[in-house]
């Protein structure tokens, strides 16, 4: 009856269930994330033991969804460079470093810091690219003794960007139009653009000259910074080899397993699905 009082025990159980549900909703994501971190560390430990190296990762997933469903895009930041510099500094000097990179690029300052620290490491350094390392990611890869890429992975040009425009395009626009016809702001941008190109070009040259020799280092540094391609142009394994870069395609299987642990948490039906094993058809066809 509506007028009857609820049994105290029933009320307690109902309240307890609601509190447990509330606690679960709060704690479940944190527990899952902790489990994910432990799974990643397990693979990194296995890879480190297998290759007898210090394994460092810089993985920027682009599909992360932020508050209210707004995409959150990750790039190379100063915080990244600080963390990686600490990791390199802590690594044994006589032990190789494997740096796994998955990034669209980011701050030139941060990328140059990482590249410089990687090049200075006394033991062999290897950059592993399972999918892509564009812009600043390529700059870091050039600092390594060996670049290891998946057969379908790509690098990219390292020409500096000023706002939304490539520095080489700004310089070219002023040259074509004529300095006397350009406004003061454009001339200032062109001056900054020239300096930015020279700075990155010289940095790439210094990264490469010990390994490739002065002439080849000059050639590569010019090709990668002169604006020959758009900034998002994908430099494939084949093209990297044609340019003269020393590229290997033997990516350890553990790296692919690791990348699986960086997937976006499922919030809706995925847009890509596949069968990860051979399926036998009814008519006997393969």
UniProtKB/Swiss-Prot annotation:
Indicate where this protein resides in the cell: Membrane
Bilayer topology reads: Single-pass membrane protein
Residue ranges of the TM segments:
8-28
Which keywords belong to this entry? Membrane, Transmembrane, Transmembrane helix
A Gene Ontology term for the protein's cellular component: membrane
Domain of life (superkingdom): Archaea
Q: Which InterPro entries match?
A: ClpP/crotonase-like_dom_sf (IPR029045), Pept_S49_ser-pept_pro (IPR002825)
Identify the main location. Answer: membrane
Q: Which Gene3D superfamilies match?
A: 2-enoyl-CoA Hydratase, Chain A, domain 1
Is Amino-acid biosynthesis tagged as a keyword? no
What Pfam families is this protein classified in? SDH_protease
The record's family statement is:
To M.jannaschii MJ1495.
What's the protein name? Answer: Uncharacterized protein MJ0137
Q: Which taxonomic lineage does the organism of this UniProt entry have?
A: Archaea, Methanobacteriati, Methanobacteriota, Methanomada group, Methanococci
